[in-house]
């Protein structure tokens, strides 16, 4: 009897190890399709992008290794430098405005009745779920220099004397792009901030107000630390989206007038698929990826230290 019990105890670890091994193999098998997809459509293109950026790669001739020449040419290319400047302007203007406006709106609607909060969340989120092409076409009509609503309102209010070609004038085109980007990018941050503010411990806020804290002090000392992770996420996502601004440019201005709305993303597309200079376009892609990674790391460092 004792021998049987001992044998049973010895067999249990073996069965446990076999079961764990089977579960591990099954887990890897379930993971395999996603892993193959990730390697094939993310890792491989990234590696090839970096690799071909060191070549003079074109559709019309064989690839020629040129080392860092593409990168050197980038910083002597006036069109690229203009696109870099425009991209940075879009990021510097749109990211803070998006975050501040979204937090302000969320703070205003989070304390409304539940039905009102839900209604405003849907209203602000509509541009996100609506196709970007459809939204862009509507804005293009509104900015039309013949029958657009902005020219009609401007003349009726006495602000302008004649129609303005908003998207065809170098003075206004980039500002119009930023305005459209702002209206289409605040929906998700508002929804996220409403959720984050709704999860703030109100007992702490009430206790602070009882102790004499103002609403601003209560927000800064109690609410802000609790919504910091959400703010970090919004900062990073908004920054990436601003750097990757492409559809608006493609559909509204094609980089014009006179390259005044060129962005790095659009210039990559134009160089690779219009001029067929794949190596040069990939070099721009590498620079863009480095810029996004560095800025995201800085944002993460600053917000974490706060």
Where are these regions (language model features)?
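A structural signal for multi-pass alpha-helical bundles of membrane permease subunits
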Residues: 22-306
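Short, Lys/Arg-rich, polar N-terminal cytosolic tail immediately upstream
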Residues: 1-21
């Amino acid at each position: 009897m004792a021998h049987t019990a001992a044998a049973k105890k010895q067999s249990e670890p073996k069965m446990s190890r076999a079961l764990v091994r089977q579960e591990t193999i099954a887990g890897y098998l379930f993971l395999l399709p996603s892993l193959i997809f990730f390697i094939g459509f993310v890792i491989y293109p990234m590696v090839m992008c970096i690799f071909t950026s060191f070549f003079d790669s074109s559709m019309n001739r064989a690839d020629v290794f040129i080392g860092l020449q593409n990168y050197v040419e980038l910083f002597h290319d006036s069109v690229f430098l203009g696109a870099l400047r425009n991209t940075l302007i879009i990021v510097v203007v749109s990211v803070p405005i998006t975050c501040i406006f979204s937090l302000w709106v969320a703070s205003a609607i989070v304390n409304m009745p539940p039905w009102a909060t839900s209604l405003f969340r849907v209203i602000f989120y509509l541009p996100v779920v609506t196709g970007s092409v459809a939204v862009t076409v509507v804005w293009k009509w509104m900015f039309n220099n013949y029958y657009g609503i902005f020219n009609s309102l401007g003349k009726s209010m006495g602000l302008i004397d004649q129609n303005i070609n908003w998207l065809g004038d170098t003075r206004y085109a980039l500002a119009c792009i930023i305005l459209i980007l702002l209206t289409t990018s605040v929906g998700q941050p508002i929804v996220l901030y409403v959720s984050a503010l709704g999860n703030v411990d109100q007992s702490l806020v009430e206790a602070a107000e009882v102790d004499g804290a103002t609403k601003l002090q209560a927000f800064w000392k109690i609410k802000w630390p609790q919504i910091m992770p959400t703010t970090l996420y919004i900062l990073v996502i908004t920054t990436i989206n601003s750097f990757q601004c492409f559809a608006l440019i493609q559909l509204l201005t094609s980089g014009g007038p006179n390259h005044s709305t060129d962005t790095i993303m659009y210039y990559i597309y134009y160089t690779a698929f219009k001029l067929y200079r794949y190596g040069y376009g990939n070099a721009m892609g590498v620079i863009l990826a480095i810029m996004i990674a560095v800025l995201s790391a800085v944002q993460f460092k600053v917000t974490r230290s706060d």
